[in-house]
Amino acid sequence: PAVSIRRLIDNKGNLKAKYAEMVLHQMWCVANLRIRSVEVQGDSAAIRFHQPESRIQFEHPWPRPMVTTDGHNSAFYLTNARELQDVPGEWYHDIDARKVYYYPREGEKMQEAEVIVPAVETLVRVEGTLDRPVCHIRFEKITFSYTTWMRPSEKGHIPLQAGMYLTDGYRIDPKMQRDYLNHPLDNQGWLGRPAAAVRVAAAKQIDFERCRFEHLGSTGLDYEEAVQGGVVRGCLFRDIAGNGLLVGSFSPAAHETHLPYDPADRREVCTQQHINNCYFTEIGNEDWGCLAIAAGYVGDVNIEHNEISEVPYSGISLGWGWTQTVNCMRNNRVHANLIHHYAKHMYDVAGIYTLGSQPKSYVTENCVHSIYKPGYVHDPNHWFYLYTDEGSSFITVRDNWTEGEKYLQNANGPGNVWENNGPKVDSVIRERAGLEAGYKDLLNIQ
């Protein structure tokens, strides 16, 4: 509304807060749009945005902002302007003056304050080649903290899903006909991948044991591509702006994201990662469409006995592609995880969510409960405990304890099996889910 935006313009109507941004709620993602100009029109305001995000925002169809007649219009907030700094605890970085302005909380003394300014986006990068992969490195009891990620304030940020941002995207009219397995396609998109504090690519058996990933400006740990093996065990992921942990390709940069990914060289696929007994909490604090764990085009990945809480969107996402066509994904397992207090900000959501064809994959003996119910979601009824989304095929969903029987099977392919899920599942399964006894100390780390 014009009342809010007036603080960003001068008496002549010119934008004085030249780095101001709008963060716009878009169904299952939020977009960061840098404001180029503002024109107040009575009780409304017309806002224009910088490129490249302006074109992508108005040309891509999904996810989109909602404008409805029943009051479910998309929420937004304004940020990155000193003129908006009016609540204790807020800060603003003036990049031209090279100053940080901070509004102290009651009782805070700046003379005694510890101030940490992140300067890098990636702390550790492990990368070889397909023919000469980096092998057998173990990180143990190391804390990875305080990274930044500047791209949203330099080029905007229009995610498609799971924090993967569109580098290009547009609507197709008329729709593109695909093979008989898949419904017609109404859009195309190409994706970029957010930065990560620790990046692993073209490697074998890179392990993380009892490490901490905290206070990070984007993804915590990322097994990007061409990684075989690797154990992530007993780690804490907390206070992270984006995704906690990513595994596998979410479509290469030049690959249209709705096309199945099935490389001729199988070494390009991330396989045999084991993620267990980790605690994920306060994830996606800035990029609300992010998850605790997101695995894309992967094979033989095992995600088990983790606890996930306080996330803005889904807890675990497995798969990619929106297609029933068989691809490189197979033999994945999500087992005995405890997911609670999820969907703090976004709907079209579930504790565990799947995409695409994944032969011989299993979602079993997990426990999901306690969804948030924010008042600004696009559809207050569009939430689920378990959700097999577009193209999900050949996946067995069995013996999961959920506090209700609210599930969705949307545009699924063949071969899915749903058995014995809901509140009547044996309480032993509910009690066994989550961190095993030797790792419950993670819940008490300050």
Task: Locate each region found by the language model.
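Right-handed parallel beta-helix
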Residues: 135-146, 184, 204-218, 227-242, ...
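Extracellular beta-rich repeat passengers
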Residues: 146, 150, 365, 376-446
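Active-site lining segments that contact anionic ligands and/or coordinate catalytic metals
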Residues: 19, 88, 97, 290, ...
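Active-site beta-loop-alpha junctions enriched in small/polar residues
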Residues: 250, 319-321, 357, 391
